[in-house]
Each structure stands twice: as C-alpha cells, then as structure tokens.
Amino acid sequence: MTNIRKSHPLAKIINESFIDLPAPSNISVWWNFGSLLGICLILQILTGLFLAMHYSSDTVTAFSSVTHICRDVNYGWIIRYMHANGASMFFICLFMHVGRGMYYGSYTFSETWNIGILLLFAVMATAFMGYVLPWGQMSFWGATVITNLLSAIPYIGTNLVEWIWGGFSVDKATLTRFFAFHFILPFIISALAAVHLLFLHETGSNNPSGMTSDSDKIPFHPYYTIKDILGLLILIMALMLLVLFSPDLLGDPDNYTPANPLNTPPHIKPEWYFLFAYAMLRSIPNKLGGVLALILSILILAIIPLLHTSKQRSMMFRPLSQCLFWLLVANLLTLTWIGGQPVEHPFIIIGQLASISYFSILLILMPISGIIENHLLKW
C-alpha cells in the first residue's frame, strides 16, 4: 500500500514540497532564510491578528488603544513587541535572502526572482502602513511625508495623494484604510509566497557552485528540516533577546508622543529597514528625481538578470565580483546610516556619493567585472 503522504491529494503537495523534495547536497546556511521568512510571516500574521482584536483604527483612540494593549491586555506587551521587532527580523531575513540570490546567481530563475521582487514591494508596503497604525508623531509625519511623494507625479499627483488620504490631509480616513490594507496584505503575501515556491520547485534550488546539481540530490527531510530548525531556533532566540531586553532599540522615541499635526518632529525618518532608500530619496534635490531614485533602488533588482555578463552563474569563483558585492553591502550600510542622520554637511555629500556608487556598482562595475573575469578564464 502506498504511504498516505504520497497518495492523499493534500498530503502529496506537502510531501513534494517539504519532505521528498530533491535538494542539492551542498546548499549552505544562506539557503535557510527562505524558510525563516515563512516563519516570520506566520509569526507576524498571528501576533497581528491578536493585536487587531484590541486595536482601534480611529485617530482619537488609536494611540490609547496601543497603550491599552501594552498595559491592560494579558501578555499584550509581548505580542506588541514581538510584532514590532518581528518586522525587523523579517527584513533582516529578506535582505540576507536577496543578497544570497545576487551572490549565487539565483536571479537566473527569472519567474522566481520576479515574484520575489513583488513580494519585497508587498512586504515594504505592509511594513510602512503598519508603522502608521500606532498614531504617534513619527507615524503621522512619516505617513504625511511618504504619501506626499506621490504629488511629484506630473498632472495627476495632487489628486492621487488626496485620493489616498481620503481628504486634504492624513486623517481618520487614511488611518482606517491603512489598517484595512495592513490587515489584508499579509494574506496576499502568503499567496505570492506559495507562487514563489511553485516556480522554485519547477527548476529546483540553486547551489553555491552555481552548477547543475541533478546528479547529486538528497531528500529535503531530514537533512534540511533539521538545518532549518537550527536556523529557526537562532531566529527565535535573537527575536526574544530583542523583545525582552531592549524592545524599543530599533524604534523611534518620537512615536511615544501622540500624533500632532501642529508640531513637526525635528528629524522625520522611517524605520531602520527603509533608511537606505530614504537616504537616496533625500540625496537628490529634485522631488520627482528623489522619488524615482527611491523606487529604482528596489526596482533595479528586476534588471540584474539582464546585466549578468559572466560565463559563471555564481560569484563563488569570481574574486573581482565578490569584491564589488561586498562593496555594495558596505555601501548599503553607509546609506542606512546616512538615512538616519540630519540633512546637513557632511551627511548630504556622503549620501549623494553613496547613492551614485550604489547605482554605479550594479549598472556599470558588475557587468564590466563579469566581462573581465571571462577574459581571465582564457589565460
């Protein structure tokens, strides 16, 4: 008799995705982040669901409802901080996952890569709207500044912004719709993640060498399930250290002041995971140019497969490209730091140079290094 996990229609899908899935025998710890992202998504949906039970999406009561969750709801404080810091963990895993894809040439799976870019945009949109919900000073002014960027779109910009706001400023209508979208988007992300996996399982996983691994496959369970559980334990430990010892480490003190449209905070800035893009936005003096830089900083990922000039897929055996990759990482860290600094000398010029080098590395230097490495192969 056939095992039920191989015959039952539903169990068969799970079996072919997580148990009997043939996986390359040499995938490293960098391949752990996909499963960790799945765990983060589940954690965010669960904690978010319990927060939504007590949250009130009205400008008058939103701030006090979050305070009520932390003070009066059983274990409300831990649910709230797990949700807030869970977002940070989500983005750490996301950046690692995208970085892995770039380093090892996983972007050659174009469908999987493009769905991944859609997922990245969806997660960023969700996180932005979630940041508005506590209705603190940074929530209100962050929402005002970021949504106002759409007014840079010629002709329809102003109408578009007022349509999104549901009025002539960020107010009750904006908060209510942001809550609605913040609630629904994670479920859309779940569906996209399933499609992401579907496309990945059409081709099979990449591996560090970038070469085909059809001749050397091992079953996903128990080898990679055990490996993923180790990653999960480290993730949970890091999250709980953050939640229990310094839950406000990554937040902004201004968000503990209720939103006040009459008082602008001295430095308006988003959460840390958006700072690199925010720094690019601020480094261009023109409004429309800044908005384009902001969008292109992520959208540039879509053309990375077209800029692949090397005969080798992975960067494992390409020292020149490796140097450029780590230069890009250092560059992004610099941009993240600059995004959190006030707009004054020397931060302005550092931000501009870092923005130029970000696009230069991706669009010019990496394709050139691929061509140089191809020539070096002939020696």
UniProtKB/Swiss-Prot annotation:
Cofactor(s) annotated in UniProt: heme b
GO cellular component: mitochondrial inner membrane; respiratory chain complex III
Cofactor note: Binds 2 heme b groups non-covalently.
Binding-site residues, heme b b562: H83, H182
Transmembrane segments: 33-53, 77-98, 113-133, 178-198, 226-246, 288-308, 320-340, 347-367
Family of the protein in this entry: Belongs to the cytochrome b family.
Subunit structure: The cytochrome bc1 complex contains 11 subunits: 3 respiratory subunits (MT-CYB, CYC1 and UQCRFS1), 2 core proteins (UQCRC1 and UQCRC2) and 6 low-molecular weight proteins (UQCRH/QCR6, UQCRB/QCR7, UQCRQ/QCR8, UQCR10/QCR9, UQCR11/QCR10 and a cleavage product of UQCRFS1). This cytochrome bc1 complex then forms a dimer.
Task performed by this protein: Component of the ubiquinol-cytochrome c reductase complex (complex III or cytochrome b-c1 complex) that is part of the mitochondrial respiratory chain. The b-c1 complex mediates electron transfer from ubiquinol to cytochrome c. Contributes to the generation of a proton gradient across the mitochondrial membrane that is then used for ATP synthesis.
Name used for this protein in its record: Cytochrome b
Organism: Paguma larvata
